[in-house]
From Swiss-Prot:
Function statement: Has an important function as a repair enzyme for proteins that have been inactivated by oxidation. Catalyzes the reversible oxidation-reduction of methionine sulfoxide in proteins to methionine.
Name of the molecule in the record: Peptide methionine sulfoxide reductase MsrA 2
Protein's UniProt keywords contain Cell division: no
Additional observations: Stereospecific for the S isomer of MetO.
SUPFAM superfamilies listed in its UniProt record: Peptide methionine sulfoxide reductase
Keywords associated with the record: Oxidoreductase
Inducing stimuli: Induced by oxacillin but not by hydrogen peroxide.
The protein's enzyme class: oxidoreductase
Family membership noted in the UniProt record: Belongs to the MsrA Met sulfoxide reductase family.
UniProt xrefs under Pfam families: PMSR
Catalytic activity: L-methionyl-[protein] + [thioredoxin]-disulfide + H2O = L-methionyl-(S)-S-oxide-[protein] + [thioredoxin]-dithiol; [thioredoxin]-disulfide + L-methionine + H2O = L-methionine (S)-S-oxide + [thioredoxin]-dithiol
Gene designation: msrA2
Length: 177
């Protein structure tokens, strides 16, 4: 199997895993921390907004089965790309959305998708999700991995109570909500 990586942030990483898991070609989705200056950060450190890291997921995928463009299509249906101050009721640096590109193809695909969404006018405000070069990724603690499976009731309450589910449904219907 050929494999590539997509590293994406869209607020709380608990809500960024499940939407990707049912698509062919996606081999794994790992919750973690990306983009900062502290090696091997802990959740507690990242939450202080002093590490430079954001909560992110790293997706391992087979490019012969699915494309980075398909992953971006899923990604933009999981969060509010018009808010760069955090996501829903999670505010601050560690919850900012970011696309971390691994190569020039990913950078161009992300720029194109962002432009396309702005031209389509799906959102009332412009899509402003930053596109940055990939620097690092550190897996989060085990209790954060596959949170939606380990804690389904809390996951559902969190997704609903934060406003994420309602936002996604209002823009995309029940896809990924």
């Amino acid at each position: 199997m050929t494999k590539e990586y997509a590293t994406l942030a869209g607020g709380c990483f608990w809500c960024m895993v499940k939407p990707f898991t049912s698509y062919p070609g996606i081999k794994s989705v790992v919750s973690g921390y990306s983009g900062g200056h502290v090696d091997n950060p802990t959740y507690e450190q990242v939450c202080t907004n002093q590490t430079g890291h954001v909560e992110a997921v790293q997706i391992t995928f087979d490019p012969e089965v699915t494309s980075f463009e398909n992953i971006l299509d899923i990604y933009f249906k999981t969060f509010d790309p018009t808010d760069d101050q955090g996501q829903f009721f999670d505010r601050g640096e560690s919850y900012q959305p970011v696309i971390f590109y691994h190569d020039e193809h990913q950078k161009k695909a992300a720029e194109f998708k962002k432009q396309q969404l702005n031209e389509q006018g799906i959102f009332k405000k412009p899509v402003i999700t930053p596109i940055k070069p990939y620097k690092n990724f550190y897996p989060a603690e085990d209790y954060h991995q596959d949170y939606y499976k380990k804690n389904p009731v809390h996951y559902y309450q969190y997704q609903r109570g934060s406003g994420r589910k309602a936002f996604i449904e209002s823009h995309w219907g029940n896809q990924n909500a």
